[in-house]
Amino acid sequence: MDLKKCLDMAEAAKAGQLPEISDLEELACLPEQHVLDLLPAANAVRKHFFGDQVHLCCIVNGKSGKCREDCAFCAQSAYAKTSAPVYPLIDSEKMFQGASYARENGVHRYSLVASGGRLPKAEVRMVAEAFSRMGGDGVGYCASLGILDAQDFALLKEAGVDRYHHNLETAESHFKEICTTHAYGDRVKTIREAKKAGMSVCAGGLFGIGESDLQVLELGLALRDLEVDSVPVNFLIPIKGTRLEKSSDLSPLRCLKIISLLRFALGGKEIVICGGRESNLEELHPLVFYAGASGIMTGDYLTAPGRNPQKDHAMIRRLGLTALREGE
């Protein structure tokens, strides 16, 4: 695919016309040596929908370890042999500290993440009660508590949590290679229930877990069909003791191609680069915005250290971009 065709696709995307599947498949199969040719077009689409504003989010690991699911990549799975921390649901004071950290560091959105297939209803109520006392003041609230039902979502929404995070993780055709203790359809149902409850949905996946380039596209199209609002893109950090500890499917250029492909497939949806940004993209990680990303996760990840928010703010300023604030 030549640069002119990419730019023509970008102009069509800006007008709300998503590319033909055959064109997206051609992008998915593009050799790595041509990936940088995608960036001007992908960046044009990002800039059309988001201007120079960048979405920043951060998370706190609200409950860690002893998860009964067997996700091949996860350090918190009971099936893994790792040194990941194990602790119960944190108290409300620690939840408040996470929100304060976001506010003090100019972060647009704060999310509480809990391990496990689903958080017990009593603990969902505890989380909702804590969020109800946080107040807004420039930060939007998100939760990632597993496979919940309509009653849970109504409780969270009433407490001021306006977005729910629940990844599909990978393409449906690859899902059973990654997880066998629950079904892909369970994740889809959760996303639909959250949307039905009137919540914004953040749903994406993890890359570098054995998926093909066409399966990257398959996931992107599934997310498009579900009409999710924000798509977190994670790149595998192989963790010793997990089934994917020796996985090495990623290069900096492949990461950029994945971002660009998703931008073309998803049009004006948020694309937020999360786990594995620095370790996989290395010196190229500031290029995520030019590849089509509209945001990044800053601060620490669930079980791995991340990047200082002030470093990310400095990078954003050097790129001529600005950090988004809640309400803008």
UniProtKB/Swiss-Prot annotation:
Swiss-Prot/TrEMBL keywords: 2Fe-2S, 4Fe-4S, Biotin biosynthesis, Iron, Iron-sulfur, Metal-binding, S-adenosyl-L-methionine, Transferase
Superkingdom of origin organism: Bacteria
Catalytically driven reaction(s): (4R,5S)-dethiobiotin + (sulfur carrier)-SH + 2 reduced [2Fe-2S]-[ferredoxin] + 2 S-adenosyl-L-methionine = (sulfur carrier)-H + biotin + 2 5'-deoxyadenosine + 2 L-methionine + 2 oxidized [2Fe-2S]-[ferredoxin]
Disulfide bonds: none
UniProt keyword annotation of Iron present: yes
Residues annotated for [2Fe-2S] cluster binding in this entry: S111, C142, C202
Pathway: Cofactor biosynthesis; biotin biosynthesis; biotin from 7,8-diaminononanoate: step 2/2
Domain Radical SAM core intervals: 50-277
Cofactor(s) needed for function: [4Fe-4S] cluster; [2Fe-2S] cluster
SMART domains associated with the record: BATS, Elp3
A GO BP entry: biotin biosynthetic process
InterPro entries xref list: Aldolase_TIM, BATS_dom, Biotin_synth/BioAB, Biotin_synthase, Elp3/MiaA/NifB-like_rSAM, rSAM
Entry-linked CDD domains: Radical_SAM
The enzyme's E.C. designation: 2.8.1.6
GO molecular function: 2 iron, 2 sulfur cluster binding; 4 iron, 4 sulfur cluster binding; biotin synthase activity; iron ion binding
Cofactor: binding comment: Binds 1 [4Fe-4S] cluster. The cluster is coordinated with 3 cysteines and an exchangeable S-adenosyl-L-methionine.
Record bears the keyword DNA-binding: no
Gene3D superfamilies the record matches: Aldolase class I
Sequence positions that bind [4Fe-4S] cluster: C67, C71, C74
Pfam families in the cross-refs: BATS, Radical_SAM
Assembly with partners or alone: Homodimer.
Family to which this protein belongs: Belongs to the radical SAM superfamily. Biotin synthase family.
HAMAP family: BioB (MF_01694)
Known role: Catalyzes the conversion of dethiobiotin (DTB) to biotin by the insertion of a sulfur atom into dethiobiotin via a radical-based mechanism.
Protein name: Biotin synthase
Phylogenetic classification of the source organism: Bacteria, Pseudomonadati, Thermodesulfobacteriota, Desulfobacteria, Desulfobacterales
Gene: bioB
